[in-house]
Amino acid sequence: MTILDGKKLSEKIKDNLKKEVDELKTKGITPGLAVILVGDDPASHTYVKMKRNACQKVGIYSVVHEFPESITEKELLSTIKMINENPNIHGLLIQLPLPKHIDTTKILEAVDPSKDVDGFHPYNMGRLVEGLDTFAPCTPLGVMEIFEEYEIDLKGKDVCVVGASNIVGKPMWALLVNAWATVDICHIETKDLAAHTKRADIVIVGVGKPNLITADMVKDGVIVIDIGINRLEDGRLVGDVDFENVSKKASYITPVPGGVGPMTIAMLLKNTVKAAKNFAKEVK
């Protein structure tokens, strides 16, 4: 059994990105990322801090626009418009979740697709489904990088994706299909989850339920990608997979923490550098 070490791979990617950023700076372009953060959610503040630290490490300029939970949709849209028009900012990230009185879809659709480094804009999602060059959401993109690094061939593989969110499940499906995998996507209404996971060569899960995937639900030699992140009452961080027992049957498995999580942030940086490179081509 091989542990798929996302932490180690993310450091390697960041080292390479730093070189790319240094090269862009010689052309007078410093990649810039703006983050919109609304409210006092501790997890959101922690994630934003991690993203800013990662930006600093590779030389990306980052700025956070913080707003109280009471901000109006109109005020938020006005800020997005200002960032869209700023040539020094190449990527714009809306830290989710947003307060209930804000229409999240409307906000995400207001982001300039060329600055949509989270890959959530319908324009970029459409291009992703068509297999065209675009910004893919960071977590599924990170999973694909893990497959590439460990030389896991996806062609013809039966893959079960558990979770059908717009952020992970649906874009994960698109990336896998584009890599010629046969993809089965499961969700809250799936009747017999184990029937789907048992026949899969690869199981990818990201729903936020500890121990959802147990050893009796997978076959020997399975490859397991655990995107879930859950904090237990004792303070431990665990994924959606019963790691201790499933790892005994798996050929490859990601740990939590240290698996997909670090790759998500690395892909945000990669998308931001890509956006800056696209901008550099336009201003030539």
From Swiss-Prot:
It comes from the Bacteria. The keyword Amino-acid biosynthesis applies. NADP(+) binds at residues 163-165, 188, 229. The keyword Nucleotide-binding does not apply. GO terms for cellular component: cytosol. Its EC number is 1.5.1.5, 3.5.4.9. PROSITE patterns: THF_DHG_CYH_1, THF_DHG_CYH_2. Gene3D superfamilies: Leucine Dehydrogenase, chain A, domain 1, NAD(P)-binding Rossmann-like Domain. It catalyses: (6R)-5,10-methylene-5,6,7,8-tetrahydrofolate + NADP(+) = (6R)-5,10-methenyltetrahydrofolate + NADPH; (6R)-5,10-methenyltetrahydrofolate + H2O = (6R)-10-formyltetrahydrofolate + H(+). GO terms for molecular function: methenyltetrahydrofolate cyclohydrolase activity; methylenetetrahydrofolate dehydrogenase (NADP+) activity. Pathway: One-carbon metabolism; tetrahydrofolate interconversion. Keywords: Amino-acid biosynthesis, Histidine biosynthesis, Hydrolase, Methionine biosynthesis, Multifunctional enzyme, NADP, One-carbon metabolism, Oxidoreductase, Purine biosynthesis. GO terms for biological process: L-histidine biosynthetic process; methionine biosynthetic process; purine nucleotide biosynthetic process; tetrahydrofolate interconversion. Homodimer. HAMAP family: THF_DHG_CYH (MF_01576). Catalyzes the oxidation of 5,10-methylenetetrahydrofolate to 5,10-methenyltetrahydrofolate and then the hydrolysis of 5,10-methenyltetrahydrofolate to 10-formyltetrahydrofolate. Belongs to the tetrahydrofolate dehydrogenase/cyclohydrolase family. This is Bifunctional protein FolD. It comes from Nautilia profundicola (strain ATCC BAA-1463 / DSM 18972 / AmH). The lineage of its organism: Bacteria, Pseudomonadati, Campylobacterota, Epsilonproteobacteria, Nautiliales. The gene is folD.
